[in-house]
């Protein structure tokens, strides 16, 4: 288990917000768009390389299918967007500029809620691998720099929220890690990496995958692994 990713991510948000305050006139859209696409390609590479850790592609396929179905039925992606809309409607700007609350809530929502934060924290807690959270840190740094040019210093405060959320998820993942077999960890890494690859594709503008709807797959992977390890299942499998 490693908290490095959560700490660096929090500091990156603070640094990004500070950079944004220095460039109140705004960062040229051409520059920010090009940088974000480049980071998206890096995210895509991390996702693809991590997917090769798979122990049982069949378990991952079943988990992704069940997870996608559950996520679509629950409309997780839609719920996240509705939450964002609700926040925008209830956090108002002061006269003459944005409030600290607006910058804090908006940046916290955008940086804390997402497959990359969840999967990165799980990876840091279970395998001690911070690569996803460190990549997310670079993305958040650039994103918060752009956000701070319009929402002000409140964006920097989101670093605390991100540390609490990602830190808690990392500690939780570290606590359950001893309960997971090596095969379960490998398949969980594979499923999570597929979600990270989807985020990378979205960030480049190539696709518009509702990645949040696939998050339940991360719960189905260890569940299916546990089921297939039961003696009853192994007896059934032996018949075939």
Protein language model regions, located:
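Structural signature of hydrophobic alpha-helical transmembrane segments
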Residues: 1-15, 58, 62, 126-137, ...
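Hydrophobic core segments of alpha-helical transmembrane domains in multi-pass membrane transport
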Residues: 9-22, 41-50, 63-72, 113, ...
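Transmembrane-helix boundary and interhelical-loop signature of multi-pass inner-membrane proteins
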Residues: 19-33, 49-55, 147, 151-195, ...
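Hydrophobic transmembrane alpha-helices of multi-pass solute/ion transporters
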Residues: 29, 44-58, 85-94, 238-240
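Cytoplasmic-side transmembrane-helix entry/capping segments in multi-pass membrane proteins
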Residues: 30-40, 61, 85, 156-165, ...
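Glycine/small-residue-rich loop that forms an oxyanion/phosphate-binding "nest" at active or ligand-binding sites
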Residues: 59-102
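Helix-loop-helix junctions within the multi-pass membrane cores of secondary transporters/permeases
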Residues: 100-175
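Juxtamembrane boundary at the C-terminal end of a transmembrane helix
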Residues: 225-240
């Amino acid at each position: 288990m490693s908290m490095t990713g959560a700490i660096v991510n929090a500091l990156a948000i603070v640094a990004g917000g500070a950079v944004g305050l220095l460039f109140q006139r705004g960062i040229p859209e051409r520059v920010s768009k090009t940088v974000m696409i480049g980071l998206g390609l890096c995210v895509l590479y991390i996702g693809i390389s991590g997917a090769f850790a798979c122990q049982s592609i069949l378990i991952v396929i079943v988990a992704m299918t069940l997870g996608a179905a559950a996520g679509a039925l629950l409309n997780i992606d839609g719920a996240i967007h509705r939450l964002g809309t609700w926040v925008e409607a209830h956090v108002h700007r002061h006269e003459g500029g944005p409030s600290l609350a607006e910058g804090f809530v908006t940046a916290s929502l955008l940086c804390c809620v997402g497959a990359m934060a969840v999967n990165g924290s799980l990876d840091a807690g279970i395998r001690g691998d911070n690569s996803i959270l460190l990549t997310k840190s670079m993305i958040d740094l650039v994103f918060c720099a752009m956000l701070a040019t319009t929402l002000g210093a409140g964006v920097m405060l989101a670093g605390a929220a991100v540390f609490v959320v990602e830190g808690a998820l990392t500690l939780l993942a570290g606590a359950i890690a001893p309960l997971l077999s090596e095969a379960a960890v490998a398949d969980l890494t594979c499923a999570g990496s597929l979600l990270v690859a989807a985020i990378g594709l979205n960030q480049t503008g190539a696709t518009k995958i509702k990645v949040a709807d696939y998050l339940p797959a991360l719960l189905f992977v260890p569940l299916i692994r546990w089921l297939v390890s039961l003696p009853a299942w192994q007896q059934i499998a032996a018949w075939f």
